[in-house]
Regions:
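Conserved DHp (HisKA) dimerization/phosphotransfer helix of two-component histidine kinases, i.e.
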Residues: 1-66
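Conserved micro-motifs of the catalytic ATP-binding
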Residues: 40-43, 80-83, 153
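Conserved catalytic submotifs in the C-terminal HATPase_c
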Residues: 70-80
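ATP-lid-like helix-loop hinge signature
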Residues: 100-124
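Acidic ATP/Mg2+-coordinating residue in the GHKL
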Residues: 133
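Short conserved segment of the HATPase_c
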Residues: 138-149
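Conserved glycine-/histidine-rich ATP-lid loop and adjacent helix of the Bergerat-fold HATPase_c
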Residues: 164-174
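Glycine-rich ATP-binding loops of the HATPase_c
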Residues: 173-181
């Protein structure tokens, strides 16, 4: 209608259509996350944490390799847990993906500095997995609302990844996701019960 009335140039129309297409992709992504959240298998099983995380990194190998991001592990042992493995992997996928994006943005011309460190520790009846990156970090202002619906630090982000990561941890694992340190390094930590009650 606006094009017919001469109110939009070809360039403006193309820009408007591209924005509309981006909005559709964002909506589709949001729907997919909702679908996965509510349809995730919730089978409690015994597994080794280190093996589970290394399997996840193997699945992410192509994505991380293309971004020239390397991953280091520390503190891991043969700790076994009775938990919902795929939920833990979903949460870590979000945290690692965010760390990767931060490193790519922070070190555009210095790929050798793109390192993610995943640290493990256990205390009493809980496990803690920290995802560390040395990117630009999270501002103090954003730190206060980082887990709020539709808040994002990324240009192309949808602001729902960390929201769902925290929600999954709290509702499915009797755990939590916290921003432990907001810069140099940025540290997000997942905690969950070693022995989840059915």
């Amino acid at each position: 209608m606006l094009k017919k009335e001469g109110k939009l140039s070809d360039e403006e129309l193309i820009n408007l259509l591209e924005k509309g297409q981006s909005s559709v992709k964002l909506l589709s992504s949001t729907i997919e996350i909702f679908r996965n959240f509510y349809k995730s298998a919730e089978n409690v099983s015994e597994f080794e944490v280190q093996t589970s995380i290394k399997n996840l990194i193997t699945l992410m190998h192509t994505e991380l390799s293309r971004a020239n991001v390397s991953v280091k592990f520390s503190g891991f042992n043969e700790q076994k847990v009775r938990q919902i493995e795929n939920i833990i992997q979903q949460i870590l996928l979000i945290l690692i993906h965010n760390a990767k994006d931060s490193l790519v943005e922070s070190y555009k011309d210095e790929p050798l500095k793109r390192i993610i460190e995943i640290k493990f520790r256990s205390f009493e009846d809980k496990c803690y997995i920290g995802v560390y990156d040395n990117g630009n970090g999270v501002s103090e202002q954003m730190s206060e609302k980082i887990f709020t619906w539709l808040n994002t630090t990324k240009k192309q982000g949808n602001g729902i990844g960390l929201y769902f990561a925290k929600k999954l941890a709290q509702e499915k694992l009797n755990g939590d996701v916290r921003l432990v340190n907001n810069a140099k390094p940025t540290v997000f930590e997942l905690s969950f019960d070693i022995n989840l009650k059915d």
